[in-house]
């Protein structure tokens, strides 16, 4: 039969092992690699004549000048979209993707603001690439929650969340 002191040592050892396993698992989760643009490939870049922008929805009409200007540019996102952003206050951006094939407008899933003060010179609050469906919004979404990268995939006509700075908390 084990003495009480031995039982305490065994129990302390088991608790220590559990704490190590839990902290190692938490570290592994927080160290998960960030989504990469290549993991969300888009089709070939669109080179045809752009469709007329759909201005029927009220939000589209409100930003018609920006959206029409964007539709006059070559594709810069997800193969056949032009992603455009504009200011919505001091240190705040919002934007939309214009489908050059259909004229449909898909607004970003919110505004992004409040990014760090000491950002690199090449910092962009909204990052995207021509041959990827991944968008990264760097800062706070809709002026709330954690500051950091928030990843979205353009899929089925909408920006779907992939992962976010709030997932790491």
Enumerate the language-model features and the residues they cover.
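Acidic, small-residue rich beta-repeat scaffolds with periodic aromatic anchors
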Residues: 28-49, 125-169
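Structural signature of eukaryotic scaffold interfaces centered on beta-propeller domains
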Residues: 70-76, 124-131
């Amino acid at each position: 039969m084990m003495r009480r002191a031995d039982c305490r040592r065994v129990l302390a050892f088991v608790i220590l092992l559990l704490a190590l396993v839990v902290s190692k698992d938490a570290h592994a989760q927080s160290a998960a690699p960030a989504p990469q643009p290549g993991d969300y490939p888009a089709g070939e870049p669109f080179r045809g004549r752009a469709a007329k922008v759909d201005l029927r929805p009220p939000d589209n009409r409100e930003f018609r000048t920006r959206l029409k200007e964007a539709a006059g540019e070559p594709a810069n996102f997800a193969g056949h979209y032009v992603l455009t952003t504009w200011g919505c206050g001091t240190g705040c951006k919002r934007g939309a993707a214009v489908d050059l094939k259909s004229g449909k407008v898909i607004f970003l899933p919110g505004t992004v603001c409040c990014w760090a003060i000491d950002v690199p010179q090449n910092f962009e609050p909204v990052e995207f690439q021509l041959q990827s469906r991944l968008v990264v919004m760097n800062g706070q979404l809709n002026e709330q929650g954690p500051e950091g990268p928030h990843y979205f995939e353009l899929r089925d006509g909408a920006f779907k969340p992939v992962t976010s700075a709030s997932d790491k908390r």
